Amino acid sequence: MARRSQGTKLHLAVLCLVVSCHAIGLSDLMERASQRSDKLHSLSTSLTKDLDSHFPPMGRVMMPRPSMCHTSSLQTPKDKEQALKVSENELISLARYLLLAWNDPLLLLSSEAPTLPHTPSNGDISSKIRELQDYSKSLGDGLDIMVNKMGPSSQYISSIPFKGGDLGNDKTSRLINFHFLMSCFRRDSHKIDSFLKVLRCRATNMRPETC
C-alpha cells in the first residue's frame, strides 16, 4: 500500500510537471530536469553500492568491460570540458537518446530483481529499480517538453537496440549480468546528469567554469 501511494504521488507529480512545464521558462525547465537527473544518478549509485556489498570477488573478474555496455557505441563528450563545446540541441538530444536506450534494460532489471541470487535485500533492490523507472519516465517527459520549446533541430531521436533478453540461466551469470547492467546504467546516468547541468548553466548564464 505504501509503495502504491508513493507511486501515485510521483505519477501526480509527473502530470503536474507535464501540465505546468508548458507555461514556464526554459531555464526553470532546465533546473527541474537537472534535479531529476541528479536523483536518478544518486539512486543508481546507491543501488550499485548495494550490489557491491553482495558481489563475490570472482564476479568482479568475470564481469564484462564497460566497452560492452549496449550504449558504448554512442559518441558522447568524455568530460565537462568537452560537453561545454557541444551545442544545446546536441546535448539534450544525447541525454534523451541515452535515457530512451534504458527503457527495455530497466524492464529486464525490474523483472529479475525479485529473484536475484545471493542478495538478502531483494526487496530493497526491487524498490530502487522501480524508483529508477519512475524517475526515468519523469525525466523523459520533462525532456520532451524542453525539446518542443527548443525547436525542431532537437527533436530527432531513435533508440539504441538492446539485445540482452535475459541475464543467463545459472545464478552466477544472473548476478554478474545484473550488476554489469546496473554499472552501465550508473555510467550513463552520470552522463545524462552532466549534460543537463551544463545546459542548466547555459540557460542561467553562469560562467562555464562554475558549471
UniProtKB/Swiss-Prot annotation:
One of its GO terms (biological process) is positive regulation of respiratory burst. The keyword DNA-binding does not apply. InterPro entries: 4_helix_cytokine-like_core, Somatotropin/Prolactin, Somatotropin_CS. The keyword rRNA processing does not apply. GO terms for molecular function: hormone activity; prolactin receptor binding; superoxide-generating NADPH oxidase activator activity. Disulfide bonds join C69-C184, C201-C211. Transmembrane segments: none annotated. Keywords: Disulfide bond, Hormone, Secreted, Signal. Residues 1-23 form the signal peptide. It comes from the Eukaryota. It is found in: Secreted. Its main location: secreted. One of its GO terms (cellular component) is extracellular space. Belongs to the somatotropin/prolactin family. This is Prolactin-1. It comes from Oncorhynchus keta (Chum salmon).
